[in-house]
Amino acid sequence: MSDDYDPTAVAFKPGDMETDMNTGEPLALEAEAAAKDPAHNEESGEDTNANVESGTLVHQGDEPESIDKEDKVEDGPDTKSDGGVLDEPKDGEQRDDEKKEEHKPENPSEEVAEDDDYVPAAVSEPVEEDSAGGGSVGGTGIPDGAISSLAASTTIPPPSDPNQVGGGASSTSNNNNSGPDNNKRKRLATDTIGILEDRIAANPRDMPAWLDLISTIVRKEKLDESRDIYERFLALYPLSAEIWIEYITLEMDNGEFKRLEQLFGRCLTRLPNLKLWNIYLTYVRRVNVLSSESDKITEARTNIIKAFEFYLDHVGIDRESGNVWFEYLDFIKSKPATTTWEEQQKNDLTRKIYRKAIGIPLNNLSILWTAYTNFEYSLNKATARKFINEKSGSCQNARQCQTVLENLMRGLDRSSVPKSGPRDEFQVRAWKKWIDWEKSNPLGTDNKAETNKRLLYCLKQAVMSLQFVPEIWFLAAEYCFDDPLLKTEALQFLKDGLSLNPNSSLLAFRLAEYYEREADAEKMRTIYDEHIESLGKERQALIEAQGDPEAEPTAEIIKLNTQISIAYSVCMKAVKRFEGIKPGRMVFKKARNTGFATYHIYVASALMEFHHNKNPTVATNVFELGLKYCGSNAAYVQHYLDFLISLHDDTNARALFEKTIPLLGPSDAASLIKSMIKFESDFGEITSVVKLQDRLRQLNPDTSPITIIADRFATSDFDVIRQCDMLQKPKSRTDEDSDSERPSKRARRTSHGNDQGDKMEPFNLPQKIDALLRQLPNSSDYGEATFDPQRLVDLFRDVRIPDGLL
């Protein structure tokens, strides 16, 4: 393909539209957008920490010594414990030099994010101008020479409403029908658009509401409003190929070819969607007329050939693209050759296309192979066998891969509109299987670039289909991190995934860890702050949905409290590693001041202090501070108890036990007593063991004596009493830890929605039938199952066996 080809510049010349020399944007479109929204470039500030720090759990004076007396922590000798019973921490004390320091909390909204506008990996690179005129536009893979509007389309333009910029779940749609005041009034039943806008404002991930709103507005046949709703949706979910197709079709139906080319430039190279690319190819062939009356037939044919090459280079590896390979071959063959040289050139190009196609696992590979052999024999029978033998091996391998790929993709949902609601575990497993298969290099090629190309194609398909599944984004990034050549793509997967899933701790922690390894403290802190801010917004929304601020928190709110506290804990440890103990303590202080910190932040801070200089005093003070607010939490008490035992501080361990037991419920108290029985049995007195066993039986009279004694003498890997005296089988650790184990039949029946088999009793097959089945090849020989196992089970269950076979 020549370097001066622009697949979207096939209908108009660069002079057809005036553009801004700085931005490359069409001036007419910029003026139109500015007329619609005069406030488009206004910025609004917001305190991003306000929603997280809305309440206070402790006063500023309630500081542990880890913050109040930092010099003592680092010096060590001044903070030695006297070894006596625990004292209450001295709250309110603060060094003079500490008071002079003024802590300025971070405000992520004041920092310039790396990617203000969400742009997927394929077009995230800036437009580079080559003084020589060569190169490509914006790193999109579209060669230079495009119309000026395309050069400015490598990023998604901001929507008409500035409040919609930023993407992700935290963005909400705002227009005349969905303002905060209008949401409070009751909508009329006929106000369909207003009702849908309210649903979207309440939940930006309400995909049925989005699709209904788009359909309703487009049916009004008002072009500007239709464009606005498409831009709003695609600003939030730019990987939705089906919506891009609708948008492009709208512009095509209205003859807006210049806008159409801009849309192609924004989405084509980043979305490996065959239907979208087919529309592009149809458009190119539509505007390049191959008429004998045309004086530009040679130029038109060249444009179409380059468009075919562009298409096949990006999505030609898709198994469903076989028809386009045939279309390209037919187009090449249709050109009349006037000289022997032209005929030879046409045959060489045709052979090149055939030989490239038959090495790809396409759905019509057998037909392609037959056509190729006929083509070679029609040219020269003497050389045909040589050419055919050279490619027969790769074609046979591609056929086998095509069979496996067909089984892998059976039942796979490749639509790219985000799916709201619970995740589909079947789809997640199916995509993982395809990704793993592509990573294994099934074609056996030595070309690393081709292997990476197929893997990236599969990964992009997966994240398009499962946009709200952070696990898939994470796996895509990790697969790319394994190859140094794909480091840029890996980082982009993390950024794009976190943009769509801002509440994902998996993606936030992994991306922050990446920046920590790159020694970029600012970006690392920004990731943590924005993640905590997003979680805080969701928590605040749930509290407001409750209606009563004094009501008991729901399970979802409690879960968010824990998630936010753990996020603070992870951030605190990272900051301590990168910047030192004092900045880490400030993160701990910020977490406590949220008003809903769970015990996790206290445990993390205490252990961080202890491992900083191995002095237990500050750590003990932090544990004691947490005891004021988490003393009725058995898990926290257990952590504190384990810490004291690790210090060989038996006196304070027993004191803590007696102090907290009255605060716990029966179940939690029993768990703590069992832990203390184990401790006394290992390191204490037998009289203490007997007393604790009596307390346990008083608390829970149904407790079996043999259970108590079995727990005392069990080790981490062997339960001597249960396994030797009671003959109980040990619990297999492989059943818990293995991710590759074969799921049970019951689990498979449940995953397919069939529970009828749960009541079936196992039965033995007749000997002759069993012998026949044993002669069949092992299922692993096929790579993937070629039949539905549930239907096979149903067949065995319902089959009538003739008496002669029994």
Swiss-Prot record:
HAT repeat segments: 221-253, 255-286, 299-334, 345-378, 404-440
Gene Ontology terms: biological process: mRNA 3'-end processing; RNA 3'-end processing
Biased composition (Acidic residues): 108-118
Keywords of the record: Cytoplasm, mRNA processing, Nucleus, Repeat
Keyword Cytoplasm: yes
Main localisation: nucleus
Regions of compositional bias (Gly residues) in chain numbering: 132-142
Top-rank taxon: Eukaryota
Residue numbers spanned by region Disordered: 1-187, 729-770
Biased composition (Basic and acidic residues): 33-43, 60-107, 732-744
Protein localization: Nucleus; Cytoplasm
One Gene Ontology cellular component annotation held by this UniProt entry: cytoplasm
Disulfides per UniProt: none
Compositional bias (Low complexity): 170-181
Gene3D superfamilies: 1.25.40.1040
UniProt GO MF annotations: mRNA binding
Alphabetized InterPro entries for the sequence: HAT, Rna14-like, Suf, TPR-like_helical_dom_sf
Function of the molecule: Component of the cleavage factor IA (CFIA) complex, which is involved in the endonucleolytic cleavage during polyadenylation-dependent pre-mRNA 3'-end formation.
PANTHER family linked to this entry: CLEAVAGE STIMULATION FACTOR SUBUNIT 3 (PTHR19980:SF0), RNA CLEAVAGE STIMULATION FACTOR (PTHR19980)
Protein's name in the database: mRNA 3'-end-processing protein RNA14
The organism of origin for this protein: Yarrowia lipolytica (strain CLIB 122 / E 150) (Yeast)
Gene giving rise to this polypeptide: RNA14
